[in-house]
Amino acid sequence: MKFCALDIFLDPSILSIGESYTNPGECPYSKRRNVQLIPLPFLGEVLENIFSLYGVAESENEGIDLVDHVLDYWPGLIDLTKIQKSILPALIEEIFDEYGNLDTELINKKVVFLPHADKSNQDFEYDLNTRWEKLSHELKYQNRFFLSEELDWDSIRTSLELLVRTHIKGGRYYRARISEDLIERSEMGKPPKEKASAGRANPIGIPYLYLATDPQTTFYESRAGLHEQIFLGEFEAKENLNIVSLERIEFLGPVEIQELGFDLEEFVRFRGFLMKLSQELSKPIRKKDSDFDYLPTQYLCEYIKSVLGFDGVQYQSAMNPSGSNLAIFNDHKVECTDVKVLKVEDVKYKVSPREET
């Protein structure tokens, strides 16, 4: 039986399952010693559903390289800092050989990604992506409350429900406010409805409580300037929170996706739509934005709040990509427990030439 290093893989579900194999040794593929190893037949069993999404192309001109597509489409699967890309074909071929239930021709020939080769799936995925654009246009310029074309709400509901994470009672979150005047702990929550401007998640006049998962992220989100005074509020969940997690959809590992309850091919069909929702929520508010720009995400967040009954959404911070934000609909479930007064001592900017359009 052959083995490879467990940490070649990024998918948290593979890492979790692989922890039961405690035999350290040398990985012949990454040329590293004293690393935790995992047997190749086990990897074949775990990865079978992923590689079953590929088939041999009818002609070389129509096909794609398996390794290239896996790395591009599933960036949450393999860690290229642990293994050279040029070694991956040999590793995957030996996984196929050791497992004995996969088509080794996928390595040596050009392949097609079957969900995209299926015309019905192409039409479905294309329709979902174009529906986002149609939804945006209709909400902005035609109908605000009653749409002329309905989305596939049953499928969207199923996908969003599978992305729910329970944030346990006692969890800590943070919010920063800029002010030269004293802000009391009782004032650190969401703004009053008469002062609530439109946000990515909330409509004008309907405030949500925007929190960050760590202090650094909320500092970035506040966009405080040098020497400005910041009030940092620490919030605690008074009860469990059911949050739809939309952060880093594109980096979900394929085994992790199945562990969440998705059929892998079905997830592929909805992936673009979920990524679009995630990306739109993550975009920072800009001065040039119109309130109209936020209508599609507001509409879907209201669906998550009012129809599905969840407590909020979580999404990646555009201001601090290593952190994430939460829009809490039911703010009575969290409480500000502490406020610190801070001063900005340093601000750094990174700029690049603007691309011509």
Enumerate the predicted regions with their spans:
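A short, exposed loop/beta-hairpin motif centered on an aromatic-Gly-Thr core
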Residues: I206-L211
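Active-site and NAD+-binding cores of ADP-ribose-processing enzymes
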Residues: M1-G170, R175-N202, G225-T357
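Short active-site loop/helix that positions an aromatic residue
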Residues: P215-L226
